């Protein structure tokens, strides 16, 4: 159990105190995978008993487990700096997370930012909960064949070899959600990833209760056509918020990492409607104050757009039966011109209209974004379009080796990362 506790905590991806222990269990497999859970699942009973019989190994294991538990209970920066903070939970929604090669549910920069944000939140003690999707194949792996052509490979992500655990109810059942799509329901399984102090919840449609075609909805990251992408974003946004509700979690803040998860603002408003008896317009106005949208895109073509007919097909019933509004009002939230029936539904527009704050990922990007979104704010001077900026960073313990950290600490001091970007120039 203690080995499992360590193997299933992604903190090992930036705190490498356990590396030598996994290497001792199976040096070849560890060097190939860097996946503690695979090593623990694959090691023979004889080998495991042999290393556990060594007093030095046992002492190191006990010390590592105790250190992990002490860290989880000790107040971190957030608790020390804001001991009376009313902020209980921030729900962070992202289409991808880059935490480790052992959990390949990412493509590139967006996942990099999301993964590092969770790791930094763990170190700082910020009360963040991540919400995402578990992909059976993830993003494709590139292979260049003998003719110089690219081949796309989709290796299968076996959940039994990933550092994740099924999310269970108090009665021990696997937590599953039912999402209604046109003409059928999709069952979603819920998983948990431990990222130090932070939890990441993942949903996937590969449930035996689903038809084969529907089991593959969460198969590929950024794969398939617009209809598949829409289904994934419905699962992420609407399914993700329902998952939090099923867990009894009521976040004060909903952070949308790009527009993929913008449907969460609709489900959050629907939940408020059910609790308060208010209509959709009031519910959206109230809940948007607690929603934050981070845009990463620098060109308008990068925003997800869906044909009006597709939105009507998949969200028409949801709008009328759950939100109490005609579908045209829902479509208007994702359009520049609400009266243009041919205009596609823009997820970034929905995210902006459903969020109380919007930010780009650098000062320059915020300036570009203000130009991109200026048409939504008629008669506003472009410099005053309400898009701020928070400069993207990285989680240094993940990317900085111990020798490099020692060198930079000697040259620039231990507090070199605590200033603003001007001090880093």
Annotated model-derived regions:
Residues 1-425:
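Catalytic cores of carbohydrate-active enzymes across secretory and cytosolic contexts
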